Amino acid sequence: MITGIQITKAANDDLLNSFWLLDSEQGEARCIVAKAGYAEDEVVAVSKLGDIEYREVPVEVKPEVRVEGGQHLNVNVLRRETLEDAVKHPEKYPQLTIRVSGYAVRFNSLTPEQQRDVIARTFTESL
């Protein structure tokens, strides 16, 4: 459990009135702010704080959003043959716009390699 504290009495003057987060499960303390001697976000063993007195301060914990290998979907509504024809005859498709990585881009402005990649990724036989 994480507890927020303000140190009110300590043998080490650098700790006086400093704010910390105590992790009782790990036995660690994370410095939030101190006048001197400790850096912001520095983590030390609680025992390193020595003999201290403190008052608890409320800590608001916001849920952390974690994105781990998320998915991204671009939807292009057209036929494979249209893109293949645009590769062969770009002059026929000057306004052909597709979605690539969340951006709208003119298909003809892509390199031939990028065009082939879009076609390969856009049209699959199965998922």
Swiss-Prot record:
This is Autonomous glycyl radical cofactor. InterPro entries: Auton_GlycylRad_Cofactor (IPR050244), Form_AcTrfase_GR_CS (IPR019777), Gly_radical (IPR001150), Glycyl_radical_cofactor_GrcA (IPR011140). NCBIfam families: spare_glycyl. GO terms for molecular function: formate C-acetyltransferase activity. Residues 5-127 form the Glycine radical domain. One of its GO terms (cellular component) is cytosol. The keyword Acetylation applies.
